[in-house]
Amino acid sequence: MKKERVLIRFRPEIYECFELEAAYQGLRVGTVANQLLISELNKAASVKPEHCVVFGSEDYAAIPEGKRSSYYVLPESKDIIEYLPEQTGKRGAKPINKQVTFYLMEDQLETLKKIVRIQDIRKSMDHGQIITYRFAVLGLLLNNEALDRKPPVIH
């Protein structure tokens, strides 16, 4: 089976979480980041498609009491956008945002596409076509406990 490559840049606060986890596990940063994303994709794929909702949305508010454990809840777009990398302005300047290449199987990529559509963040699609996975990937990773140690973003 062929794997698809998805390249995503991360803020230093997020990348440092990958580095800490990689040091703890004795693995490479990219390997750890891939494991974390695939873990979250598997969690999202394990629930019914209609049980994957965005925190604070109408669908989230409609979750019956006591049924939250059967749902996969994505962070709000404002929380995802807060952790998106800033654009580096100077040409030739070394970017502070580190890139990670994710390798996804076809079924994992399909789950990621569903997440993009569920999030419905304007910048991730153009006329129904997905143009970036960065919001979906970051949203999934923010749900992982390995990123719980990330510091707040200081603007």
Residue ranges and their predicted role:
Residues L84-K94, K98-M105, K114-Q119:
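Long, contiguous alpha-helical segments
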Residues K43-R91, P95, N143-H155:
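Short, positively charged interaction helices/loops
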Residues E16, K98, E110, L142-A146:
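Extended, non-membrane alpha-helical segments enriched in charged/polar residues
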Residues R11-T31, Q35, V54, I81, ...:
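Surface-exposed, Lys/Arg-rich phosphate-binding patches that contact polyanionic backbones
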Residues K3, P95-N97, R134:
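A general secondary-structure signal for short beta-strands and their flanking turns/coil
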Residues K3-V6, C17-E21, Q87-T88:
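Short, contiguous, well-ordered secondary-structure segments
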Residues Q25-H51, K123-H155:
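Short, basic amphipathic alpha-helical segments that act as recognition/interaction helices
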Residues I8-R9, Y103:
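Short helix-capping and inter-helix turn/linker motifs at the boundaries of alpha-helical repeat units
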